[in-house]
Design a protein with these regions (language model features):
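Sec-dependent signal peptide recognition
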Residues: 2-8
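N-terminal signal peptide c-region/cleavage motif recognized by signal peptidases
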Residues: 14-16
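N-terminal leader/targeting segments
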Residues: 18-71, 82
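Residue-level detector of intrinsically disordered terminal segments
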Residues: 10-12
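Short, solvent-exposed mixed-charge patches
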Residues: 140-142
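Short, hydrophobic/aromatic-rich segments at coil-to-beta transitions
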Residues: 48-53, 108-114
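Long, charged/polar, surface-exposed segments that mediate recognition or autoinhibition
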Residues: 20, 61-113
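Short, exposed beta-strand-loop hairpins at the edges of beta-sheets
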Residues: 114-136
């Protein structure tokens, strides 16, 4: 449980009118710059999971990027973060925390949060490994 709260504390990002950061990585930057920042922070590409893997505040995470479904070439559409968790009620724990931190978005849809003034949206999902955090930037084309 302590691991969960340390991770969530790390994910309480800075709200800014110009950019949204995940672990200090500006998601509104170009894909090339985001990739360089990911490498600089020690995340490495893992072929078996088809994702970057590394430690975020002492917790192993897996990150993948969607740069294909975008409104502007060279920008990031989505950052997908998988957080392995064994707790049966992991999704419930995480959403209760985010309900306190962030405003719900998308007409009050459950598990969808507005996390920045720039239009970045976070959707919290359950996955086979734990939880999945999907950050959709303003450049994401649905």
């Amino acid at each position: 449980m302590k691991k969960l709260f340390v991770l969530l504390a790390a994910m309480v990002m800075t709200l800014s009118a110009s950019a949204f950061d995940f672990d200090g990585i500006n998601l509104n930057a170009s894909v090339n710059k985001i990739s360089a920042e990911i490498a600089k922070r020690g995340y490495v590409y893992d072929e078996t999971t088809d994702a970057f893997t590394g430690m975020c505040q002492g917790t192993q995470i897996y990150m993948s990027m969607n740069w294909k479904d975008v409104k502007e070439a060279g920008k990031l559409g989505q950052l997908i973060v998988d957080v392995p968790m064994k707790e049966q009620n992991a999704l419930s724990i995480v959403t209760k925390m985010f309900n306190v931190i962030y405003h719900t978005a998308d007409g009050g849809k459950a598990n969808v949060y507005s996390v920045s003034n720039d239009g970045t949206i976070l959707e919290v999902q359950s996955s086979s490994k734990g939880i999945r955090l999907v950050y959709s930037t303003p450049f994401y084309k649905k």
